[in-house]
Amino acid sequence: MVRARTLMLQGTCSGAGKTALVAGLCRLLARHGVRVAPFKPQNMSNNAAVTADGGEIGRGQWLQALAAGLPAHTDMNPVLLKPEAERTAQVVVQGHVTGRLEARAFREARQPLLPPVLESFQRLCAAYDVVLVEGAGSPAEPNLRQGDIANMGFAEAADVPVWLVGDIDRGGVFASLLGTLEWLDDADRRRVEALIINRFRGSPELLGEAPAQLEARGGVPVIGVVPAVPDLHLPEEDAPYRMAGPRGSGGALQVVAVAYPRMSNHDDLDALDAESGVHVRFARQPRELDGADLIVLPGSKHVFSDLAWLRESGMAEALYRHCRYGGRVVGLCGGLQMLGEGIEDPEGVEGGGSAPGLGLLPVHTRLAPTKQLAEVHGHAEWPAPVAVTGYEIHHGVTGAQEGLFPFVARSDDGRVLGSYLHRLFDSGPFRRALLVEWFALEGEGGDEQARIEAELDRLADTLEQALEPGWLKALGVPARPST
């Protein structure tokens, strides 16, 4: 059996652009008829997506699967760590929760996770022509190298070549690329085949001889200077979301999401933010809710602690004040649970006990050990009979005596809404109906997935022009016609 061609993108730091580059390469290869699949051995994120095979993976791999034209599958991200507290994370293996670990214990637990990681990787290699692997953080962490399954430890175990990515937009890209190479031991360094300078603004000629000097000192070729793509908006797992500032200009509708400590799935608001006439920002302090037309309580990885934080920080009182003056509120997943009358945890999912909710929706939640994972396609009755799609990821069952419609719960006065559906606002007809009903704003109601697809095409175009053709040809991209 012919083994799939494999390549791993590692970065000099977190946020170097690995996720987007893998997504762009997936789209580029798929456009040229290459059967390509993404893979990330270990991910740490509370932004997760439900897969077609009934599990969950990081949103980054969901995006990369979309770029490759594939349904997301749990093999694409076999180990997902979802932080619940400062030093504790839920461990998801091949799509399903296997337990919880403290940070110290995870070091010892990594090596037993390597077999399922390799099992998932090998299945993808058997099914596709190319498998593009994304690393995590930086490989130049000598304290983490032993037992590593996220970067060079995986690359060694699976015998995968590496391209190293540095972000010039942060500054110091040449030092970070060369420094990363210097920190690697000889065997790991030999695995690095190429360097990429990412997110450059301006003409590459401005770099002068610096790339050549980097090649000479590091012994590894620079195969591309990738420009920053103007106004590129793709879902990101760990993007530095925009904190609340002064009210936007031009009379835009102000949507403010509460950024509690264990917030999850902040990208649920991307489709709203893409609407003309809508401005989305995030708030951590009560005063930052001032001027909001709509307040959103997003998902939460630990509902009890985030609910307590709302009260202790003064956010709850600011939310009540917003409602008294006619403001609108939406709660998604954990946000829905917090907006209800109360939450019970009889089986200790979050430590046990109970807590009163904010009392803004006539619902009550009981947490349960079994996690609900489902892709959802259906119809909402309010604010209009329209189709909705999304997915559910939650521990808990929420019931109501009244005010509960298919997919949404609504307060008696119609100003507070809650739903378990992540990506609810991606449903264009629902989003437009809500903006009209609440704010008389004629939203565009565009297809969010179509918007993302167009952005992926822009990114793929950029990579095809920026990376050296010979290196792309080795992955299956035909040479560009000469001009």
From Swiss-Prot:
Coiled coil regions, renumbered to chain: none
A GO term for molecular function: ABC-type vitamin B12 transporter activity
Pathway per the UniProt entry: Cofactor biosynthesis; adenosylcobalamin biosynthesis
Domain named GATase cobBQ-type: residues: 252-430
Origin superkingdom: Bacteria
Disulphide connectivity of cysteines: none
Pfam families on file: CbiA (PF01656), GATase_3 (PF07685)
InterPro entries: Class_I_gatase-like (IPR029062), CobQ/CobB/MinD/ParA_Nub-bd_dom (IPR002586), CobQ_GATase1 (IPR033949), CobQ_N (IPR047045), CobQ_synth (IPR004459), GATase_3 (IPR011698), P-loop_NTPase (IPR027417)
The entry's keywords: Cobalamin biosynthesis, Glutamine amidotransferase
Biological process annotations from GO: cobalamin biosynthetic process
Active site per the UniProt annotation: C333 (nucleophile), H422
Matching PANTHER family: COBYRIC ACID SYNTHASE, DETHIOBIOTIN SYNTHETASE
NCBIfam families noted in UniProt: cobQ, PRK00784.1
Its job: Catalyzes amidations at positions B, D, E, and G on adenosylcobyrinic A,C-diamide. NH(2) groups are provided by glutamine, and one molecule of ATP is hydrogenolyzed for each amidation.
Family: Belongs to the CobB/CobQ family. CobQ subfamily.
Protein name: Cobyric acid synthase
